[in-house]
C-alpha cells in the first residue's frame, strides 16, 4: 500500500509505502482466510492420499511478507509443497504489467519469482500464470523461452478456435508451450457460491461439473484466495463448502484433480490458442481496460516504464526495488474510471476516493523517485572524476567568476 504523498513531499520524504498498513493487511489476511484455508487444504490433501491436487500462484512480494510477518502460514505452504500434490506456479515477482511494457524486465521479474519459489519450497516452477491471466501469442512465446512449458490463461471465447475452454491448447509461435484456458463460467459460479452460500450447494455445483461434455478433457477452475474469506459466514462455512465439494468430486470418480502441469502432460493439445491482442481474466470484455482504460492510467504506466534506463544507470538495489514495487498492477487499477468503486467488478477494494486522487498520489511518488535517481546518477558522475579533472573544472569556474567580476567592475 502507498502512503499519502503530497506534491510538497517531493524532495522531503523518501518513504513511499505504508508499511504499517501493509503489515496489518497481511496479518488480517492470514487470520481471516490464508491460514484457515491452507490448513483445510492441507487436511484435504492428506485425507485423499494423492487424489486431490491443485496449484497456487503467490507473488514474490506476498511471499516475502508472509515470510516476515506470518511464519505459521509459511510453514503451511512448505508442508503443502512437501506433499507433492501442490504445484507452485510462476508469475511476475510483483504482480506487474511488465509483460506489456518491456520484454527484458518481464523476464527478469519472472526469473526472480522462480528463484524465490526455489529458495522457499525447493521447487522449480514449470507452469506460468501472468498477472490477471494477461496473454498474447508473443507473451506466450516469451514465457516458453524463459523455460516454462505450460501457461494458464483466461478462456475468453474470442480466443478459441472451434472447441471450448476445457482442452489443452498450444501457443501458435511456440507449439511446445501448452495453454490451459480457465473455464470462466464454472469458475465464476464457484466464486458466487463462495460469496453467497444460498446460491449453490456443493451437491448442485458438483452436478454442474458432471454436465460438462464427456468428451472434454480438463476443466481449469481458477479463483482468488480472497474468495476463501472465512469472515463472510459464521463457523467457517466457506471451508465447509469447499471440503464437501472436493469430497463429492473425489468420491464420484467422474473427475480427478490434477495440477496444471499434470493436465498439460496427460492431454494432447487440440489446436492453437490465438490472441494477437491482449486478453485478461479481469472483466467481462477480457481486455486491458482495468489498467489501461483511461489517460491517467496510460500516462502513469508510461512514466514508470520510462524510468527503467535511469534505474539501470543508477544501479542502486534500494532504488531498483522501489521502482519494481511501483510496477504492481493494483496501482493502475485504482486509477480506473469505468469500474471505479464498483463492488460487483473484480475483487479488489479501492483505498482512494477517486481515480484522480490515486493518479496524483502515484505520480508524486514517481516524481520524487525520478529526482533521487537523477541525483544518484549525477553523484556517480562526480565520484568518477579524477583529481586532475576536478582541478580543471574548478579552474574553469574560477576563470568564469573572474571574468564576471571584471565585467561588473567595468
Model-derived features with residue positions:
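Short, well-structured secondary-structure segments
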Residues: 3-102, 126-129, 149-154, 259
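Alpha-helical scaffold elements lining the catalytic groove of polysaccharide deacetylases
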Residues: 96-119, 176-215, 232-235, 281, ...
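Active-site and substrate-binding clefts of carbohydrate-active enzymes
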Residues: 1-32, 36, 167, 173-177, ...
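Catalytic domains of cell-wall/extracellular-matrix polysaccharide-remodeling enzymes
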Residues: 111-165, 228-242
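Acidic, His- and aromatic-enriched active-site or binding-groove loops in soluble protein domains
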Residues: 73-90, 123, 144-164, 169-181
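Short, solvent-exposed loop/turn segments at secondary-structure junctions
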Residues: 60-64, 93-96, 133-136, 157-158, ...
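Well-ordered, non-membrane alpha-helical segments in soluble/globular domains
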Residues: 27-42, 70-75, 107-110, 196-208, ...
